[in-house]
Amino acid sequence: LSADSSILLDVRDLSVRFRTRDGIVRAVSELSFTLRRGETLGVVGESGSGKSVTSLAIMGLLNRATADIEGEILFEGTDLLRLNKNELRQVRGRDVSMIFQDPFACLHPMYRVGKQIAEAVRAHSNVSRSAAWDRAVELLGAVGIPNAKVRARDYPHQYSGGMRQRAMIAMALVHNPDVLIADEPTTALDVTVQAQITELIDRVKREFDIGVILITHDLGVVAETATHVMVMYGGRAMEYGPANEIFNGAQHPYAWGLLESMPTIEKRLDVLVPIEGSPPSLLHPPSGCPFHPRCKYRFEPCDSRVPPLVEIPGGHRDACLLPPERKREVWANRISRELGVAT
């Protein structure tokens, strides 16, 4: 058991490899992070960075016939990777729950929404069907579905995209989990509904006193709700620390690139600055730092050494070989450009 009793989830050196006809896909490599009660960990990165694979590994939803998983995933001291199927089923959905990307694909089109939530209630509770139905209606109301008693009898196609996502959040909360994983919960929703869903997840965290892992490519969502941020690239953590430190003092060139490509009201740039190039192949990853082929600050060691995630002051960690003084210089120049100040 971790010495820090406030830690709900402690992921240590997690690596996930998929065996394919073409070779080994290194989806996640040596990933470590913690989640405490009351925290929201925002996991950001481009598609293929390993964000969703990490969440599926935590939930025990990867097929062990094709996936090799190493490391530890400790939930309140218990390694989830060492549990058998029955033991894991007792944890999944009850202690650790997940909101998936596409609510329409996750809800069965032939069953009423309330019935599907009620089934989730009965999966871990010895309650009657009527009691489970009442709980489903209660949860639908709690997540903002109007006239929940009536709408519980609707089918998924009768719900809007935002309402379907609210129903998925209700389903994830049926057993008051300690950890809630939200995998791209605002994908394909309009901006107004995105804000409502993000606000709902944040309210749920406060009211239920849980830990949330928010997986997204939207830095704006992370800036609004996350207490901590982990930046992933090529299956590895590039930077990890308190959200205010990441947004106000990022140390990794990839994090700089993500921030420069994010539009904000404060920026005085005429155009956003894209990150040149494409994410690496996880089947044939580059040697050394996975970001070095796209990094404009790379120097000699970057193509041969994999930088470790090392701690710097303030509980902040980054995986970059660039000297600290050079990082400070780059960050100062970036701020000056945004403010329109000559350097």
Report residues per predicted region.
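Short catalytic/signature loops enriched in Gly
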Residues: 5-7, 146-150, 240-343
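ABC-type ATPase nucleotide-binding domains, specifically the catalytic core motifs of the NBD
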Residues: 18-22, 60-65, 82-88, 111-131, ...
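P-loop NTP-binding/switch modules centered on Walker-like glycine-rich loops
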Residues: 46, 60, 181, 185, ...
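Conserved ABC transporter NBD signature motif
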Residues: 67-79
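Conserved ABC ATPase signature
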Residues: 154-159, 163
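A short, proline-enriched helix->beta-strand linker immediately N-terminal to the Walker B motif
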Residues: 174-178
